[in-house]
């Protein structure tokens, strides 16, 4: 008989990822799997047993090809003719480099209240420093997972 994990048995770990020269889509897939808990053998789609992810150096994230200038994120205000679009380049000009990764991860999660709760486990910071040092996050090396995860210049 298969057992489900109880809330009292869930343990949340902390992971730290350096986003320097990381490809946005590849980084977002790794983060979404960790946040949902798919990296654990106790994964269950209706339970929130994912881990916390701290991403640093978000301003040094990379896009492949010409997506930095040409990719468009759409949203709608709800009014007629209210469709808005913005590119990653314009988001960086507005000092919102974390929105690019947050949108990518959010759109990889299933929609619903559980996904909103899981998205709060993603902590994004510019620069090297972050306030989560006391949780002793485990450093994830993106290049060791797959050498295509980083862009080498």
What do the PLM-derived regions correspond to, one by one?
Residues 1-103, 109, 113, 136-153:
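Ribosome large-subunit tunnel/peptidyl-transferase-proximal elements
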Residues 99, 118, 131-134:
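Long, well-ordered early-domain segments
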Residues 112-125:
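C-terminal structural segments of small proteins and small subunits
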Residues 125-141:
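Acidic, Mg2+-coordinating catalytic module of metal-dependent nucleases/exonucleases
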């Amino acid at each position: 008989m298969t057992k489900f994990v109880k809330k009292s048995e869930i343990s949340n770990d902390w992971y730290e990822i350096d986003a320097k020269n990381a490809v946005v889509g590849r980084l977002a897939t790794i983060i979404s799997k960790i946040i949902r808990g798919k990296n654990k053998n106790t994964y269950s789609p209706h339970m929130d047993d994912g881990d916390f992810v701290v991403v640093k150096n978000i301003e040094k994230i990379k896009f492949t090809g010409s997506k930095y200038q040409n990719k468009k994120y759409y949203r709608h205000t709800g009014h007629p003719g209210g469709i808005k679009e913005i590119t990653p380049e314009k988001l960086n000009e507005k000092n919102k480099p974390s929105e690019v990764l947050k949108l990518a991860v959010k759109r990889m999660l299933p929609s619903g209240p559980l996904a909103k709760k899981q998205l709060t486990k993603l902590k994004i910071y510019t620069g090297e420093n972050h306030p989560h040092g006391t949780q002793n996050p485990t450093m994830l090396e993106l290049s060791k997972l797959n050498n295509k995860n980083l862009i080498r210049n």
